Amino acid sequence: MIEIKQVKTQDEVNYTFVEKLMHTAFPQEERRDTVQQREYSDNNLRFCNNIILENGNSIGMISYWTMGDFYYIEHFAIDPSLRNGGYGKRVLEMIKKQLKGPIVLEVEEPNDEMSTRRIHFYKRLEFTLHKKPYMQPPYRKGDNGLPMLLMTYGDIDMESDFEKVKKTLYKDCLLYTSPSPRDPKTS
């Protein structure tokens, strides 16, 4: 049985698994620094950093933000030794039921086989690809933004809400200059 469990730094074993998987699955420019990630995990009320367990065994991680009008999946990864085993599909089906609201996530532009496959994976799970220009802001001062695309699931009209969603992500989640993660009203 798969379980998605919020994890904080005090849970050293599970948090260490999540942190190592994030560092393996995402290059530095696609994730915040370790200190800030830990701070958000422990203190930001809108940020949920989760370990994915199957029968008590660690198999992956997923982090998302509660944004009011939608949820934003920031990072999702299955242990590399377990990929292509159907876990990703099962976890996203669970998340879609648990979150009970529109979901937004970022994907790399389809410039290679892996990014194309990832987009098709999300499409099979009923996510819609939006081709409007979108730049993921840098996680660190001095880094460059990354060209990405947004995908959505659920009742969200990106024709009219794209700019609002983008501004919310920029303001509340992604900028290294964002306010202190301790203040859920401004973080």
Segments predicted by a language model, with ranges:
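Short amphipathic alpha-helix that is part of the acyltransferase structural core
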Residues: 1-35, 148, 161-175
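Active-site rim helix/loop that mediates acceptor-substrate recognition in acyltransferases
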Residues: 26-49, 53
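Conserved acetyl-CoA-binding loop-helix of GNAT-fold acetyltransferases
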Residues: 78, 84-97
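Conserved GNAT acetyl-CoA-binding A-motif
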Residues: 99-111
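Conserved small/polar residues in nucleotide/adenosyl-binding loops
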Residues: 176-182
